[in-house]
Amino acid sequence: MNDKKNFSLLGHNTFGFNVSCKRFVEYSSTEEAQQLVASLDDTDKPLLIIGGGSNLLLKEDYPATVIHSAIRGIEVLDKAEGLVRCGSGEVWDDIVDWSIRHNLYGAENLSIIPGEVGA
Protein backbone atom coordinates (compact mmCIF):
# COMPACT_ATOMS: atom_id res chain seq x y z
CA MET A 1 0.00 0.00 0.00
CA ASN A 2 1.25 3.45 -0.90
CA ASP A 3 0.33 6.02 1.78
CA LYS A 4 1.54 9.61 1.41
CA LYS A 5 0.87 12.89 3.19
CA ASN A 6 0.43 16.25 1.42
CA PHE A 7 0.45 14.54 -1.96
CA SER A 8 0.21 16.36 -5.30
CA LEU A 9 -2.72 15.25 -7.46
CA LEU A 10 -1.15 16.71 -10.61
CA GLY A 11 -0.72 13.25 -12.15
CA HIS A 12 -4.18 12.14 -11.05
CA ASN A 13 -6.42 14.64 -12.84
CA THR A 14 -6.66 15.19 -16.57
CA PHE A 15 -7.17 18.94 -16.18
CA GLY A 16 -3.60 19.08 -14.90
CA PHE A 17 -4.29 21.19 -11.83
CA ASN A 18 -1.48 21.08 -9.32
CA VAL A 19 -3.55 20.63 -6.19
CA SER A 20 -2.68 18.47 -3.22
CA CYS A 21 -4.53 16.31 -0.76
CA LYS A 22 -3.95 15.85 2.95
CA ARG A 23 -3.45 12.09 2.48
CA PHE A 24 -3.23 9.90 -0.62
CA VAL A 25 -3.59 6.13 -0.33
CA GLU A 26 -3.18 3.73 -3.24
CA TYR A 27 -3.90 0.05 -2.73
CA SER A 28 -2.98 -2.80 -5.07
CA SER A 29 -4.90 -5.77 -3.67
CA THR A 30 -8.24 -6.62 -2.13
CA GLU A 31 -6.48 -7.35 1.16
CA GLU A 32 -4.89 -3.89 1.16
CA ALA A 33 -8.28 -2.31 0.42
CA GLN A 34 -9.78 -4.14 3.41
CA GLN A 35 -6.90 -3.02 5.65
CA LEU A 36 -7.35 0.54 4.45
CA VAL A 37 -11.09 0.59 5.15
CA ALA A 38 -10.49 -0.82 8.63
CA SER A 39 -7.91 1.89 9.38
CA LEU A 40 -9.95 4.93 8.29
CA ASP A 41 -11.25 7.34 10.90
CA ASP A 42 -12.99 10.72 11.04
CA THR A 43 -9.79 12.62 10.19
CA ASP A 44 -9.84 10.98 6.75
CA LYS A 45 -13.29 12.34 5.89
CA PRO A 46 -14.68 13.32 3.52
CA LEU A 47 -13.13 10.52 1.48
CA LEU A 48 -12.58 11.01 -2.23
CA ILE A 49 -12.21 7.84 -4.30
CA ILE A 50 -10.70 8.50 -7.71
CA GLY A 51 -9.82 6.63 -10.87
CA GLY A 52 -8.00 8.29 -13.75
CA GLY A 53 -9.18 11.75 -12.74
CA SER A 54 -10.96 12.46 -16.02
CA ASN A 55 -14.17 13.57 -14.30
CA LEU A 56 -12.42 15.37 -11.48
CA LEU A 57 -12.15 19.13 -11.20
CA LEU A 58 -10.39 20.27 -8.06
CA LYS A 59 -9.73 23.99 -7.90
CA GLU A 60 -8.05 23.91 -4.50
CA ASP A 61 -6.25 21.48 -2.22
CA TYR A 62 -8.38 18.61 -0.93
CA PRO A 63 -8.48 18.72 2.89
CA ALA A 64 -8.84 14.99 3.50
CA THR A 65 -7.99 11.54 2.14
CA VAL A 66 -7.94 10.56 -1.53
CA ILE A 67 -8.06 6.84 -2.34
CA HIS A 68 -6.95 5.25 -5.61
CA SER A 69 -7.01 1.62 -6.69
CA ALA A 70 -3.97 0.14 -8.40
CA ILE A 71 -5.45 -3.35 -8.67
CA ARG A 72 -4.43 -4.71 -12.07
CA GLY A 73 -5.19 -7.82 -14.03
CA ILE A 74 -7.58 -9.18 -16.62
CA GLU A 75 -8.97 -12.69 -16.79
CA VAL A 76 -11.54 -14.40 -18.96
CA LEU A 77 -14.23 -16.03 -16.83
CA ASP A 78 -16.38 -17.35 -19.68
CA LYS A 79 -15.16 -16.88 -23.27
CA ALA A 80 -18.44 -18.11 -24.81
CA GLU A 81 -20.37 -15.48 -22.86
CA GLY A 82 -17.65 -12.84 -23.22
CA LEU A 83 -17.36 -12.53 -19.45
CA VAL A 84 -14.17 -10.86 -18.25
CA ARG A 85 -12.99 -9.82 -14.78
CA CYS A 86 -10.54 -6.96 -14.49
CA GLY A 87 -8.89 -5.06 -11.70
CA SER A 88 -10.41 -1.77 -10.63
CA GLY A 89 -7.18 0.05 -11.47
CA GLU A 90 -7.19 -0.96 -15.14
CA VAL A 91 -7.65 1.81 -17.71
CA TRP A 92 -11.04 1.36 -19.38
CA ASP A 93 -9.85 1.94 -22.95
CA ASP A 94 -7.08 -0.63 -22.41
CA ILE A 95 -9.73 -3.18 -21.41
CA VAL A 96 -11.64 -2.51 -24.63
CA ASP A 97 -8.44 -2.93 -26.68
CA TRP A 98 -7.53 -6.12 -24.80
CA SER A 99 -11.02 -7.53 -25.40
CA ILE A 100 -10.76 -6.91 -29.14
CA ARG A 101 -7.30 -8.52 -29.31
CA HIS A 102 -8.77 -11.57 -27.56
CA ASN A 103 -11.76 -11.79 -29.92
CA LEU A 104 -14.21 -10.73 -27.22
CA TYR A 105 -16.47 -8.29 -29.00
CA GLY A 106 -19.29 -6.04 -27.90
CA ALA A 107 -17.53 -3.30 -25.96
CA GLU A 108 -16.07 -1.50 -28.98
CA ASN A 109 -18.53 1.39 -28.70
CA LEU A 110 -17.09 2.09 -25.25
CA SER A 111 -13.62 2.76 -26.65
CA ILE A 112 -11.87 6.04 -25.86
CA ILE A 113 -13.92 6.56 -22.70
CA PRO A 114 -11.45 8.01 -20.20
CA GLY A 115 -10.99 6.66 -16.73
CA GLU A 116 -10.44 3.44 -14.91
CA VAL A 117 -12.67 0.42 -14.44
CA GLY A 118 -13.41 0.82 -10.75
CA ALA A 119 -13.68 4.57 -10.54
Where do the PLM segments sit?
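Anion-binding (especially nucleotide phosphate/pyrophosphate-binding) glycine-rich loop
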Residues: 1-119
